[in-house]
Regions:
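Hydrophobic alpha-helical membrane segments of integral membrane proteins
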Residues: 6-13, 34-35, 84-85, 125-147, ...
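Membrane-interfacial loop-to-helix junctions in multi-pass inner-membrane proteins
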Residues: 26-43, 80, 105-119, 131-137, ...
Length: 220
């Protein structure tokens, strides 16, 4: 029996909800531990889902939600490759959450961290679940902005402010490169679903250009 894709989508929704809850809970003494405990539970659930998908050698699972571009919606898919990275990322997220339950109490300005940490985890997972160019780029940019917010949590430190500026410039360049790559993959018909892109027969020159753009976009 395949792991339902709803597990991952509900997990992402829970992480986004925890991000919202981080705003009022940051003012409470126990708020830090509550947020990190929540992200720990969600990360372990998604880690288990990814691992089960791999161990059972399940067929790809997919879902389309009535969001995003009107003619394709928001497409999500889990196959063996994405399940592997879901397991890896959520293993790291669970470890970071466990560490944060203790270390987070020393944070002087938790309101600058607690809303963005769960949102960043949600963004990373959404990137792996995305099955169309629009959803991928939206998730990618959301992940980039929330990670930038975490970098800037200690913005009064000069090195942090400079690092945040460099990161934002590089992330914007990366998004532009990925946007161009998806445009080439979509072709003149504008098929932004990944299934449509996979079906396209690209010339060697276009394929090489797409590879270069993806390496630039992901590497930045």
């Amino acid at each position: 029996m395949a792991v339902p894709i709803g597990l991952f989508l509900i997990g992402d929704a829970a992480l986004l909800a925890l991000g919202g809850a981080g705003i009022p809970l940051a003012r409470r003494p126990a708020g830090t531990r509550m947020i990190y405990a929540g992200t720990l539970v969600v990360s372990l659930a998604m880690l288990g889902g990814g691992a089960l998908h791999l161990l059972r050698d399940s067929a790809p699972i997919a879902a389309t939600l009535p969001l995003g571009l009107p003619w394709i919606g928001a497409c999500f898919r889990v196959d063996a490759l994405s399940a592997f990275f879901l397991a890896v990322i959520n293993l790291g997220a669970a470890c970071a959450s466990l560490y944060g339950m203790g270390y987070g109490s020393h944070e002087r300005e938790p309101q600058r961290v607690l809303p963005f940490f769960p949102a960043f985890l949600a963004g990373m997972n959404l990137v792996l679940l995305a099955d169309d160019g629009f959803t991928f780029l939206l998730s990618w940019e959301f992940m980039s902005l929330t990670s930038w917010a975490l970098v800037m949590a200690h913005h009064r430190a000069r090195d942090n402010a400079r690092a945040g500026f460099v990161y934002l410039v590089m992330a914007s360049f990366g998004t532009l490169a990925l946007l161009l790559a998806f445009g080439l993959l979509a072709g003149p018909d504008g098929g932004y679903a990944f299934a449509t892109m996979r079906a396209h027969d690209l010339s060697p020159a276009i394929a090489g250009l797409v590879l270069g753009l993806v390496l630039l976009g992901a590497g930045s």
